[in-house]
Amino acid sequence: MSCPAARKGRQQPGFACEECRRRKARCDRVRPKCGFCTENGMQCVIVEKRQQRGPIKGQLNSMQSQLELPAGIPPVLDDFDIQASGLSEHDMSLVAATSVGTSTEASLILPAALDKLELPASSEAAAAGLPGWPEWLDWQDMNNSSLILPELTASTLTDPLSLDSLNGSPPTMVDSSSKIQMTDLIRAELDQLYFDRVHAFCPIIHRRRYFASLAQDNHTTAQLCLQSAMRALAAAMSANSSHLSEQFYSEARSLLDTHSQTPATPRDKIPLEHIQAWLLLSHYELLRIGVHQAMLTAGRAFRLVQMARLCEIDAPGGDLQLSPVASSSSSISTNTDSSESFVDAEEGRRTFWKKWHVFLHADTMQNSLTRLLPIQVSTRLPAPEANFQNNQPTRTSFLADAMAQTGPSTLSPFAECIIMATLHGRCMTHRRLYATEFEAGTRDFCIRQGWLATAVERRVQMLVPSPAVDSDPMLLFTHMLAYRATVHLSITVQQASWRTVDQQVLAAAYQQRAAQAASEIVRLAKAVPYLSPFKTHPFLPDTLACAATFLSTQTATDGGGDDIQHLLRVLGELQDTHSLARDYLQTLKLQVQGNRQDGWY
């Protein structure tokens, strides 16, 4: 029995021409010109690729009714991927319980269920009266982790104050760092990280007292400012927590700005934590943002230090009125011998000297004359770290007495750094003063030049090399700063117009000292990689760049090019954590490249 013949398809293969489609006539689909167009002498236009047909009749109305009904939300939530959304099961239960009742919540479509709804294109939706995608929503950049819906968090659903900010505000496309949910464990880790890395070059916080304040139930605004500033700086000095630094910085900055705008009465006293927070934020900005913003922020701290009169903590007959700075736990009192009062006064001293230290380096980088050096300072130098942290009162020298000291030094690394920074600042002032106002080479110039050279040389000899230099960022920076002062004195001498043979011999001697000092900076720079970039002093790149600039401007010497390349490598290792290193590295590379073209090395 033979099989029946296959039925011929009713529709011929291919597409009908546009003229037959318009006339609703049967097209024979002959190519290149169908029979109807041939008989009527018309142009036969055939479109091979056509857009897909629109929704079937009633589909748009059905979808629109589903969007308007609250009952359409629960099925979407059932299919939503909780793991990919980043929301906990508790948060999702809150969403399901509170998302029924308003049209705004009912129209919230989660990304994981959008493919199932098959929404029409924007033009078709507009024709149907449906709202299209907002302009701020880029579908190609949207994923379950980067799209943050503020309505779908437990904190916003339970906090009535946060609900007001949701009206009319679109979801925010942000990175994960600005929306990290801080836990007590994260804060504890950053607090510990601060004392492990930051405190070494910014020793102004008493460790035991700080952790005791954290255990309190109520914190003042100044304490919250200090906590956020410390954690921001600690996160900036960590690879694992670096993404948290911007969030803590913004929080601290907002708290400080709000606190600064609060009207104060004459009886109010400046919280010491407020000044410390501004100083720490200036260090953060120096590491992350840039020197100009850091100096603007440091200026806020400078003015607060002057208002609090921290330079008069140890003035003769000093009392509470002479130091109107208030700590959160107790007020500074210079007349009692209790250990707590010593810690109060010592924190005030360290805050003042840190401000002094930052000011001197800011003055150096901004190339301006130092005006605060001649002022009378009635605050003693910082006590040794062990005495400070263990509440053991001790009496230290004033700055002027310590600079005149000739015997072995018994001061703390922080105090030694302050003395050397002061000498370095005076060398810079001496250089600029005689370059702008007086003639270099005069008698006054020679006297001051000789005094500074002797003072720096004596201080270098007092800084006996020790194994701690390679592991202490403050000591390492102090040694480099001493050699940098020698380099600046040599540069100052080169600007003088020497007339006698003795003066020219003296200038050559200064040049030789500067070359040796630059070599010592290169030697000390070899310890920076072992110290770790996360513990390196924020102002260290400035000293490295000074040595590299001096070496690059000298004539070719044995190993001079290798020393410069080593300094550039160290700056390259610091550029990820120190903005100064990034800025100087680009400038020095161009300078070195130009010197190579000149055939120096």
Curated annotation (Swiss-Prot):
Gene knockout outcome: Results in the significant down-regulation of cluster B, whereas it exerts no influence on cluster A.
GO BP: DNA-templated transcription; positive regulation of metabolic process
SUPFAM superfamilies in the record: Zn2/Cys6 DNA-binding domain
PANTHER family membership: C6 FINGER DOMAIN TRANSCRIPTION FACTOR DBAA-RELATED, ZN(II)2CYS6 TRANSCRIPTION FACTOR (EUROFUNG)-RELATED
One cellular component (GO) term of this entry: nucleus
Biotechnology: Azasperpyranones display potential anti-cancer activities. Azasperpyranones A, C, D, and F exhibit potent growth-inhibitory activity against the A549, HepG2, HCT-116, and HL-60 cell lines, with IC(50) values of 2.39-14.42 mm, respectively. Moreover, azasperpyranone D significantly inhibits HCT-116 xenograft tumor growth in BALB/c-nu mice. In addition, azasperpyranones A and C can bind with four kinds of therapeutic targets for cancer, eEF2K, FGFR, survivin, and TNF-a.
CDD domains in UniProt: fungal_TF_MHR (cd12148), GAL4 (cd00067)
Xref: SMART domains: GAL4
GO MF term list: DNA binding; DNA-binding transcription factor activity, RNA polymerase II-specific; zinc ion binding
Keywords, comma-separated and alphabetical: DNA-binding, Metal-binding, Nucleus, Transcription, Transcription regulation, Zinc
Localization terms from the record: Nucleus
Chain residues forming the annotated DNA-binding region: 17-44
Induction line: Expression is induced by the azasperpyranone transcriptional regulator ATEG_07667.
Database matches in InterPro entries: TF_fung, Transcription_factor_dom_fun, Zn2-C6_fun-type_DNA-bd_sf, Zn2Cys6_DnaBD
Biological function: Specific transcriptional regulator for the azasperpyranone A biosynthesis cluster B.
Gene3D superfamilies found in the cross-reference section: Zn(2)-C6 fungal-type DNA-binding domain
Entry protein name: Transcription factor ATEG_07666
